[in-house]
Amino acid sequence: MELQFRELEIWQTFWTGMGAAGIWLMGVVFFIWVGFRLSGNLYANAEANVVMRIAATGFCLCVAYFALVWFAMTEWHANGVAGAFLDLKGSVQGLSPNGEMFLAGSDPRAPMSLMPNPPQGILLLCALSIQLMSIWMPKKS
C-alpha cells in the first residue's frame, strides 16, 4: 500500500515541524544569552577559579553544538518536505505554484549535515569568540 498525501497535509506537516523548531530556537537563544552572562561575570571577577572557567567553556561549546544541530534539523526538515513535494509533483495531483517555489529553493532528500552555511558559521564563531575571550582573557585594569 502506497501512502498518498495531499499538498495541504504536507504543508501542515512542514509548519508543525517549524513550530517545534521555533520553540527549540528560543531555548538555544536563551542559552546563548546565559553563556554571555557567564562569560561577562567571569571577565568581571578576577578571582574566578579555573574550574568555573572550564565549566563555562564547556557550557558555551555545548550551546554552540545545539545551535548547529538546530540549523541542521530545520534544513533537513525543509528538505524532507521538499522531497514529499517532489513525489507529489510526479503524481496525478500535481503541485501548486507555492509548492513549486518551495521545491526550487530546497534540496530534496539531501542528507542531514552539521556544516553550517556561511552566515550561520560566522554567527556561531562570533558568539563563541566573544564568550571564550571573555572567559579566558585577563581583565585589563
Regions found by a protein language model. Name each.
Residues M1-F36:
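Cytosolic-side membrane-entry/anchor segment at the start of a transmembrane helix
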Residues L38-A55:
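Amphipathic, cytosolic membrane-interfacial segments at TM-TM junctions
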Residues G19-A20, G94-S129:
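Hydrophobic alpha-helical transmembrane segments
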Residues V29-G40, S113-S141:
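Transmembrane alpha-helical segments in integral membrane proteins
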Residues I54-A82:
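Hydrophobic alpha-helical membrane-insertion segments
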Residues A21, L25, V29-W33, V51-L68, P119-I122, S129-I130:
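Alpha-helical transmembrane segments
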Residues M73-M101:
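Juxtamembrane non-transmembrane "cap" segments at the membrane-aqueous interface
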